[in-house]
Amino acid sequence: MDSHSPIATVAQALRRAERILVITGAGLSADSGMPTYRGLGGLYNGRTEEGLPIEAALSGPMLRRDPALCWKYLAELGKACLAARPNAGHEAIAELQKHKPECWVLTQNIDGFHRQAGSPAERLIEIHGELAPLYCQSCGAESGGLEEHLHGQLPPRCAACGGVLRPPVVLFEEMLPEEAIDTLYRELRKGFDAVLVVGTTASFPYIVEPVLRTRQAGGFTAEVNPGVTDLSERVDVKMTGRALDIMPQVVSHIYR
């Protein structure tokens, strides 16, 4: 490989770095067969069968007002996640974390693929939550995994009190989880030597801020994306392509 190629440049920077933040979005899981979408989980674009914007169907207010409708689309989202698996991009990121004990992952994805690929939970910030375990909105009781509830009557109900179950995921019009935000900003205050943005359109402040902060502090920044994003001209190196193809090359170049 050309020692001046984007992949070689990123590999060299990551080899030197100790504190690393990898930010991932729907584009990473698209390579596992998950459709991309700029918001929740990457499943939909446009309107539902009922003529609603998907943001309205998969929202906190809709879950309260019409839980059956909200769960119709939560169930499709869940089935898509359960039918897919982590890909080589997830595995390469987990491998990087294994070698770099201060490498963190901040993900917008709710599919759990980083955990499945081996990323340590204590260095994984799931900013939009995850799809399991379900819990009761009324009494708070946990009710197991997602799969057992997807093929019965919707919305799924709590065995203890009959309340509507939900996953610990951030729906539209809901607040981001306080613990995840606190963890992110605690680590940001410590600073990062390098930030790598993988498969996200970077339209949220908590995606953009770590990149800008790190670059202003003299750190290294890079992006992996097949298209142009808001960050493409604001990072040190842009790697054009799929995370599935690029991330294994980056990590193997570090540890070859």
Swiss-Prot record:
Source organism superkingdom: Bacteria
Keyword Disulfide bond on entry: no
Top class in the EC scheme: transferase
Entry keyword set: Cytoplasm, Metal-binding, NAD, Transferase, Zinc
One Pfam family matching this protein: SIR2
Binding residues annotated for Zn(2+), in chain numbering: 136, 139, 158, 161
MF (Gene Ontology): histone deacetylase activity, NAD-dependent; metal ion binding; NAD+ binding
Cofactor binding note: Binds 1 zinc ion per subunit.
SUPFAM superfamilies: DHS-like NAD/FAD-binding domain (SSF52467)
InterPro entries linked to this entry: DHS-like_NAD/FAD-binding_dom (IPR029035), NAD-dep_sirtuin_deacylases (IPR050134), Sirtuin (IPR003000), Sirtuin_cat_small_dom_sf (IPR026591), Ssirtuin_cat_dom (IPR026590)
Residue ranges crossing the lipid bilayer per the database entry: none
Subcellular location, record wording: Cytoplasm
Positions with a binding annotation for NAD(+): 25-44, 108-111, 199-201, 225-227, 243
Function: NAD-dependent protein deacetylase which modulates the activities of several proteins which are inactive in their acetylated form.
PANTHER family in alphabetical order: NAD-DEPENDENT PROTEIN DEACYLASE, NAD-DEPENDENT PROTEIN DEACYLASE SIRTUIN-5, MITOCHONDRIAL-RELATED
Alphabetical list of NCBIfam families matching this protein: PRK00481.1-3
Protein name stated in the entry: NAD-dependent protein deacylase 2
Originating organism: Pseudomonas aeruginosa (strain ATCC 15692 / DSM 22644 / CIP 104116 / JCM 14847 / LMG 12228 / 1C / PRS 101 / PAO1)
